[in-house]
Design a protein with these regions (language model features):
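Conserved N-terminal helical subregion
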Residues: 1-3, 20, 45-173, 177, ...
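Glycine-rich FAD pyrophosphate-binding loop
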Residues: 20-40
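Active-site substrate-recognition segment that forms the wall
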Residues: 184-217, 231-233
């Protein structure tokens, strides 16, 4: 049996590894000419860790990521609102950079399974993935893992407009090795926004800030000063 997986992101690569384990021969179609670092961090909770363990990736995640034993939610004054103790519940949780997880998945897949610079424009229910410049690729299974603007979804189910979630965000990974963050993930809730951070492995910290804005609102030219009371004072968040 052969399967066609469209998209070489986290979901597509996970599906490819699972299909390999099930004895199916998958081929992965990726429109990018090369796989570059994309996105920033992930928090892998217990269910995700169990899923990755079933793919043979748990030890890699533990090595390349960072253990997270608790999560904290705080107000702008730094006062604790909620504490989730993952370790006490036996919930194995890790923070990891997307690029680290993606690379680990790529290493678990035979190189000849991956076809880069291949754009899929849709699929048929008979198992054909339609390409923009070559003949279709056929398999008994087609897995659409081509992201938020999925061509597979659109070709099978029609147009589905994106729904605005009410927030915009800034995200990044930063080298931070002095140990003050430890094994915790922290999110600060402010008026109309917030800020979160946590360990991502190998001396890196994943952080993000978000604010609630109407759909279509223009983004500020400079994020500095747009903390929306996420911290007190805001200058602490946006200092050079």
């Amino acid at each position: 049996m052969q399967a066609v997986v469209v998209g070489a992101g986290i979901g597509g690569l996970a599906a490819t590894i699972a299909l390999e384990h099930a004895g199916v021969e998958p081929i992965v179609l990726e429109r990018a000419p090369e796989l570059r670092e994309a996105g920033f961090g992930l928090v892998l909770s217990a269910n995700a860790v169990m899923a990755l363990d079933s793919l043979g990736l748990r030890d890699v995640v533990a090595t390349r990521g960072a253990r997270v034993t608790q999560a904290e939610i705080r107000n702008p004054r730094g006062e604790l609102l909620t504490l989730i103790d993952y370790e006490a519940h036996g919930w194995e949780t890790y923070g990891i950079l997307r690029s680290s997880l993606q690379q680990a998945m790529l290493e678990a897949i035979p190189f000849d399974r991956l076809r880069l610079n291949t754009t899929c424009i849709g699929a048929n229910e008979d198992g054909r993935a339609l390409l923009d410049d070559t003949d279709p690729v056929t398999g008994e299974i087609v897995v659409g893992a081509d992201g938020i603007n999925s061509a597979i979804r659109r070709s099978l189910f029609g147009e589905e407009p994106l729904r605005y979630g009410g927030h915009r965000a800034w995200r990044a990974g930063t080298r931070f090795e002095d140990g003050r963050i430890g094994e915790r993930f922290v999110e600060v809730w402010g008026v109309g926004g917030g800020f979160g951070f946590g360990p991502a492995g190998r001396g890196r910290v994943y952080w993000y800030c978000f604010e609630s804005v109407p759909e279509g609102a223009p983004a500020p030219e400079q994020p500095r000063g747009s903390s929306s009371a996420a911290t007190a004072p805001g200058s602490t968040l946006f200092r050079p």
